[in-house]
A protein has these predicted regions:
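Membrane-interface aromatic/basic loop that binds lipid-linked glycans or pyrophosphate carriers
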Residues: 97-139
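Catalytic core of nucleotide-sugar-dependent glycosyltransferases
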Residues: 43-50, 57-83, 107-113
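Structural register within alpha-helical repeat arrays
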Residues: 89-96
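Acidic/histidine metal-binding catalytic segments
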Residues: 21, 86-89
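Short flexible/disordered coil segments
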Residues: 21-34, 74-82, 99-117
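Conserved nucleotide-sugar donor-binding catalytic segment
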Residues: 1-58
């Protein structure tokens, strides 16, 4: 099977019309469920944070909407990897509320999006931290 055929099977989802981009992690993790991937730990691209139009520095609503769905995907599909990388999953629990608030979602809507009671409880407990980070990012 050719790479292009595999890529055609996994389309980039658009959960919200305000999304400017779909985080590629979502597609790559879905692909990894079916196919084995090899990773080469070598830098192939350099991102500069000091550019005026840098996507990595700007915090806007459309980016927050995309990040919200990325964090939500991590919580609902990758929580079983908490043993291997607990910091990664903790960031997702905080990030889902932070970017949820930045994109205009209510707390009840954020909690409703989690697929289990335990995940909802963790998100609820870390929601104040996400709210504080939301207020810091607005400035």
């Amino acid at each position: 099977m050719y790479k292009i055929d595999v890529l055609k099977q996994y389309r980039f989802p658009t959960y919200d019309p305000r999304m400017r981009f779909c985080p590629e992690n979502i597609v790559w993790f879905e692909m990894a469920r079916k196919y084995k991937m090899r990773v080469i730990d070598e830098a192939v691209r350099v991102y500069y944070h000091d550019a005026v139009n840098s996507l990595m520095v700007v915090k806007n609503v459309r980016r927050s909407v995309s990040n919200y769905y990325m964090w939500l995907y991590y919580l609902n599909n990758l929580s079983r990897y908490v043993i291997y990388n607990p910091i990664f999953i903790l960031k997702a629990y905080v990030g889902v509320s932070m970017d949820g608030f930045l994109s205009g979602k209510k707390a009840s809507s954020i909690l409703y999006s989690c697929d289990s009671i335990i995940k909802k409880l963790f998100v609820f407990c870390l929601m104040p931290l996400g709210y504080i980070l939301n207020k810091i990012n607005i400035k």
